[in-house]
């Protein structure tokens, strides 16, 4: 996996697991963590997933003109990827749909 990444292969994240969603994500993150840094894993979960789905024109990064469903986390996933589970607020289509403040 590391050799392919270093050669420029783009990994994107996705799962069709029959585990409950959060458990599936934890397993995927554990597997990714064996080969990639937290910053690389975050890119795999976001912009690379959009690239893999050929939706990077509208998804994957916070840029003008793109859809911006946003998670506000209690912690920085770039320093500890497990922080993706510490969800404080979810904003979807401009509305707060989860508020754990």
Regions found by a protein language model. Give the residues of each.
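Short aromatic-centered micro-motifs
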Residues: 90
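His/Asp/Glu-enriched, well-ordered alpha-helical/loop segment
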Residues: 1-74
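Small/polar (Gly/Ser/Thr/Ala-rich) solvent-exposed segments
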Residues: 79
């Amino acid at each position: 996996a590391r050799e392919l990444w270093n050669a420029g292969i783009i990994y994107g994240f996705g799962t069709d697991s029959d585990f409950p969603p959060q458990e599936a994500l934890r397993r995927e993150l554990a597997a990714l963590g064996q080969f990639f840094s937290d910053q690389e894993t975050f890119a795999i979960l976001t912009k690379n997933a959009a690239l893999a789905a050929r939706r990077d024109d509208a998804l994957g990064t916070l840029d003008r003109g793109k859809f911006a469903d946003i998670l506000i986390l209690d912690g920085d996933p770039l320093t500890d990827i497990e922080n993706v589970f510490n969800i404080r607020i979810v904003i979807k289509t401009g509305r707060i749909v989860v508020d754990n403040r």
